[in-house]
UniProtKB/Swiss-Prot annotation:
EC number: 3.8.1.5
Domain AB hydrolase-1: 35-134
Subunit structure: Monomer.
Catalytic activity: 1-haloalkane + H2O = a halide anion + a primary alcohol + H(+)
Key words, A-Z: Hydrolase
Gene symbol of the encoding locus: dhmA2
Protein name: Haloalkane dehalogenase 2
GO cellular component: extracellular region; membrane; plasma membrane
One of the record's GO molecular function terms: haloalkane dehalogenase activity
Disulfide cross-links: none
Protein's UniProt keywords contain Hydrolase: yes
Catalytic residues of the enzyme: 109 (nucleophile), 238 (proton donor), 267 (proton acceptor)
Record family assignment: Belongs to the haloalkane dehalogenase family. Type 1 subfamily.
Amino acid sequence: MSIDFTPDPQLYPFESRWFDSSRGRIHYVDEGTGPPILLCHGNPTWSFLYRDIIVALRDRFRCVAPDYLGFGLSERPSGFGYQIDEHARVIGEFVDHLGLDRYLSMGQDWGGPISMAVAVERADRVRGVVLGNTWFWPADTLAMKAFSRVMSSPPVQYAILRRNFFVERLIPAGTEHRPSSAVMAHYRAVQPNAAARRGVAEMPKQILAARPLLARLAREVPATLGTKPTLLIWGMKDVAFRPKTIIPRLSATFPDHVLVELPNAKHFIQEDAPDRIAAAIIERFG
């Protein structure tokens, strides 16, 4: 299944590019020149989430932002399970296809585990790490486990698939200022029906189901990436990834880190504070 949607060039002023992975066709943007930065989104977003950051960085960095299979403008292939390890393998293929070297790895939400799974297998090619409102270890709080179980229940799965619950409810709830109608239209347009939303519906299940991968990342990220220069950027009003719970663990994992707190940002920091994020990346790595 392909997505028939053309983004507004005023909001998304980028050329669409495509990569035929072993599992399906990936849409991505590749803007600017300079040191590469891989921008990995979460659920239920797509590369559109990074639009303002890309515009701010592309004079200094090569900004590479893929849409996972099942997200954004990428294909919804039959036979793809939309599990996190599958996404990571496809994005790994994509990184190798582009030949990214000495790249910055940025992830938010599920972009954290996916970007880290790619990076641990290519640690010698990773220049630095940028993480925001994310994690990469097995769910270890009652809140995360309960969220996964509730979102995996038949009534909520129905709401995700049939009523676009994640886009309609969680994006507005996860931003300090409700996105404009034009912005929300771009999130809706790439998840037009139940068949298109299978990837969105699977991700909350993966909080528990991806435990083997997350356990491996909990071991391998400190061992392979722990000495990399790191930027932690945190929306301090995020009720899902609470700073007091997660920042101490990330700080211990990456001793060479700089922490930037975004006091007025919630979960979707790229919507709430794109200029602050871009400035922090330039200051740390520019």
